[in-house]
Amino acid sequence: DHAVLAEESGWTRRGDDRPTWIVDPLDGTTNFVHGIPQFAVSIGVAVGDRVEHGVIVDPVKRDVFRAGRGVGATWNGRPCSVTSRPGLAGALVATGFPFKAHELLDPYLAIFRDVFLACKAIRRPGAAALDLAYTACGLFDGFFEFRLSPWDLAAGALLVTEAGGVTSDMDGGGDFFATGDMVCGTPGVHADLLDIVQRHRDRWHSE
């Protein structure tokens, strides 16, 4: 007996430690609708409050990203890892706009500005699950976004940690499933991103 938490259905059962499938059948919906080939299926399996397995599939590029707790991460069957980037200098960072929380736009843009000035470049592809997968596999050095949903994060967050990266909420803790706020990357990039986010904490934390 399993539970399902999905963007299209919500909880089907809760309240115990049996496996919960956390599913986003189409991450990057706007891209899909407009014919932009950047979207994915994201599936995580949690036992209790920990995601134990995750898979992200890009049906256009035929990429499959997998992770299991304690066994590492793979990209199309080959082990993958985050980059060795020691900090934001020279880093390629991914992000997403706070389209679900317009009240965060001003603090987000302040954070964006500081990250932009500190790194090599920023990309906003429009599918958070793939942003996390690409961070895990070394295409991006880090990622940050406000107000994501559990199905956006479940598989990708596990991928990043199993690939040697660091994940946290905007305060540096582990409550990103509850808050929907994610900062991740190589250890050094994560630390630099978190430092910038915290500079503006009074602005976004009050919203």
Which role does the model predict for each range below?
Residues 3, 7-9, 164-181, 186:
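Acidic, metal-binding active-site segment of PIN/NYN-like and related structure-specific nucleases
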Residues 15-19, 88, 136-139, 177-179:
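A short, glycine/Asx- and small/polar-enriched loop/turn
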Residues 29, 58, 160:
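Conserved G/P- and acidic residue-centered "switch" motifs that form tight phosphate/ATP-binding loops
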Residues 43-132, 179-207:
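Acidic beta-strand-loop-alpha-helix segment within the catalytic core
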Residues 133-136, 157-162:
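Hydrophobic residues within well-ordered alpha-helices
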Residues 137-142, 165-166:
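Alpha-to-beta junction loops
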